[in-house]
Amino acid sequence: MDTLSYKTISANKETAHKEWVVVDATDQVVGRLGSKVAKLLRGKYKPDFTPHADCGDNVIIINADKVKFTGNKWNDKVYLRYTGYPGGQREMTPAQLMKKPNGEEKLLKRVVKGMLPKNRLGAQLLGNLYVYAGSEHKHEAQTPKSIDINSVSYTHLTLPT
């Protein structure tokens, strides 16, 4: 038995098969949508997943203004940020955040960012996420595939062919 023939394949920037996918966020719960999008960005459904490399897909989220929260989280959930100055802790609810310019994009990017690694790779992966409030996006040249995020399961993530 030749054990030298068993090589572990690690994906890198050149060998990663990155695709463009479109996810419709209409009537999706924010946390569940963010979790599945983070897995798509990370590439965890791919057989050549490598933890230290960007081998995930580029994800376009459309209809970000139609997401929903369960319960009364629109008004009860609080997002905190700190300005860096004494007494500079600011809080904002999702309802207040959605009223701001590009609030839909900021909300979903913040949710997905919390589910990615807290290092340089996580920042790079977040750059592969594009969020749009309406149904139009500017990435038609990349010919993205439209996927149903509900059909993407936790145990076996698959993309339609």
Predicted region positions:
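Basic side chains
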Residues: 18, 44, 81, 110-113, ...
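Positively charged, low-complexity, intrinsically disordered RNA-binding extensions
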Residues: 107-151
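Ribosome large-subunit tunnel/peptidyl-transferase-proximal elements
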Residues: 2-84, 89-106, 144-151
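Histidine (H) residue identity feature
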Residues: 17, 52, 137-139, 156
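Conserved small/polar residues in nucleotide/adenosyl-binding loops
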Residues: 155-161
